[in-house]
Amino acid sequence: MSVFEIVFSPTGGTEKVSCLVAGALDKNTVTVDLTDSGLDFHEVSMTKDDVAVISVPAYAGRVPAVVVDRLNMVHGNGARAVLVCVYGNRAFEDTLVELEDVAKRAGFRVVAAVSAIAEHSVARQFAAGRPDAQDAAQLAEFAQQIQQKLLAEDASEPSIPGNRPYKQAGSHRMAPEATEDCVFCGACAAACPVCAIEKGDPKRTAGEACISCMRCIAVCPRGARKLDPNKLSAVSQMLSKVCVVRKECELFI
């Protein structure tokens, strides 16, 4: 049995959670990076004896569309799947049920699901420092329960919260822009999951292609990519009404 860690983590928060879950199941995992636009996902294939921890962020309560497209290329071949949804302390809404449907279409058997919290990718002040020690302890406990289910060869499906049809996907995108501090190193263009930044001129961003994942901000070595401060302020004000109270990780098994 191999444990695959299939993860989409533009700013690193989802990866932290994913590692806590997958690493507790097996210290030697096979990583599939869904942010890698150069990877041929048709070549990703598992067997029925394998386990896949599929970890994605919630974008306005949905699975990012690019994740759906790339998971549709993967061959689950009956492998058992543990679904992980990570959100910035607002809500994950229909993300897990959508991920369940996508995983099943790709040939996985869903045996467990986890929702967890990480620092908000846009307004970083919300859920700052998470996953923290309390989250890590809780996720380790979840992983132990999942491991017991796997060892018992219990393939029963969990009851996962969410709605079908899913909520409408968010349409308001915010594309970060390069500031005067940009030195044209190209790190942002190389890392963009959807190739929305021109490699020859990283100050040019295709707004219609950008998915507002904030990866370019996260990888810029000079902090030279920023969101429009007025738009960021508006988002922060909106989130302040729903992100103040700490939300906890949940296990669905």
Model-identified regions with their sequence ranges:
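Reductase modules of NAD(P)H-dependent flavoproteins
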Residues: 159-162, 170-180, 184-185, 189-190
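Charged, low-complexity surface patches
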Residues: 91-92, 181, 209
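Iron-sulfur cluster-binding cysteine motifs and their immediate structural context
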Residues: 178, 186-211, 215-232
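FMN-binding flavodoxin-like domain, especially the glycine-rich phosphate-binding loop
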Residues: 2-36, 42-173, 230-236, 240-253
